[in-house]
């Protein structure tokens, strides 16, 4: 078993353990492998180990990888855009990705809707919440959620699937859980209003257990699978 396959198995075990401890089934939590800055060869190793959902933060890099695997005839992969989205890059996301986790304003949602090719299924979108109210991060407040969700739900080429957040780093489990629970409450409310909503993208390597205990349905894990990132390229 190579390193990536071994790492994936360990991460899946951690997810299963975290789910079991709070009475949830492991299948309720999707593992999103964050492959930003990693070469296609690393993704190929993850695919060989059964991984199908991948997250990319940089539009151009992600599109190159998507094209690489399409040209190689590899099907059944899911590509999630999880980085900050600028208006001038929205067309590439709309044309190539299956999911966008970082919708935080109507302007971006409208552009994605207009630019999504008609022959593709609707782009699955998550509304990004700035749950820790950090100026350095994208996302809306929970107070602004209802209005934006209602507007996105009207766009025919987008499918509102839920919420995403990147909480501020917290070392204590109790604090992590308290923040995650705020997201879980908002997610539960959203689910009652929109039948397509089923995804709470919350939790990374350091806070995954608390996120799963609070109700996360998707965790985003990178370094624990692929190793340290090289940002020099």
Q: PLM ranges: what are they?
A:
Residues 218:
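Conserved N-terminal glycine/acidic-rich loop preference
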Residues 210-213, 221, 225-233:
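Expand to "…catalyze enediolate/carbanion chemistry for C-C bond making/breaking, isomerization
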Residues 1-206, 214:
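Conserved alpha/beta-domain cores
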